[in-house]
Amino acid sequence: MSLPSELQRPVGFDRLYGLEIDLATPEEMRARVQVTDDHLQPFGLVHGGLFASIAESITSMGSWLGVRDEGKSAQGLSNQTSFLRPLLGGTVHATARRRHRGRTTQVWEVDITDDQDRLCALVRMTIAVRDAP
């Protein structure tokens, strides 16, 4: 599956932390980030903000894929991240699935896992759907 041209190379903040998109559809997104020392908090664990950032980016992208042809844009409205297991290194894997598509909002759930497919965080994202600028 080929990615839409807008998602083939990360830009801005996504490029800064190393986001790589593996699957992009309006219903499901998959991505990963190779952990570096820049992703760690002072105690050697992957910073929770990385998990939240990945979730917000990929759910906004997936939502946008479903509304762009309607002249709409998509951006994070609410990000609720539950941290379940520390991640020390390797790769952060994220799988996002759309749970609700409304006229002005979408709700997504994101599983954040490690290289052993162990669940490290659960994220629930609410995405605002607005007229494109």
Task: Provide a role label for each language-model segment.
Residues M1-P133:
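Terminal targeting signals and extreme-terminal segments of soluble enzymes
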